[in-house]
């Protein structure tokens, strides 16, 4: 994970063979920073790492990794993945990042690769999403939004950036 070309060069000196372009940067900031690496174009992004296991606290420890869901006051559901080995949770955003439909802007940034992060998707949904991205990014054609996303996704900081 490299915020600028100087950090990227330092990471490479220490043996990193692939870097990730920060999802916090917007399109202009990515272009201006000179950061090279792979770019996340799909995935539920981590919002928080909790220092305690929600599963263990609420239902008792099962000793195996699993997905639970938190619901907020607006009925948004946030996936929670427990990491049993170290007894903590990763809480993900309720909507996945999706840069489907923005392939011209993304490829214009010349990332070394694009990456889809699958975390909580069912296999069939992951297949639909992968097919749509392959169609658009792999063959440079405009792809239809897979039904599984149903307009429930975010563009993240790609159009906004961090303030």
Roles of regions detected by a PLM:
Residues 1-163:
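Active-site pocket-lining/capping segments in soluble small-molecule metabolic enzymes
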């Amino acid at each position: 994970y490299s915020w600028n070309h100087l950090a990227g060069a330092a990471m490479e000196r220490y043996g990193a063979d692939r870097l990730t372009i920060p999802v916090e940067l917007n399109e202009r900031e990515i272009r201006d920073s000179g950061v090279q690496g792979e770019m996340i174009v799909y995935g539920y992004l981590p919002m928080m790492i909790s220092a305690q296991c929600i599963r263990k606290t609420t239902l008792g420890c099962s000793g195996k990794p699993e997905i639970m869901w938190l619901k907020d006051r607006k009925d948004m559901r946030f996936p929670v993945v427990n990491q049993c080995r170290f007894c903590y949770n990763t809480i993900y955003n309720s909507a996945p990042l999706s840069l489907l439909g923005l392939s011209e802007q993304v490829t214009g940034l010349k990332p070394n690769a694009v990456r889809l992060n699958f975390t909580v998707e069912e296999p069939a949904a992951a297949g639909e999403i992968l097919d749509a991205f392959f169609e658009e990014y792999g063959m440079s054609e405009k792809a239809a939004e897979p039904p599984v996303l149903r307009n429930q996704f975010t563009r993240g900081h790609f159009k906004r950036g961090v303030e």
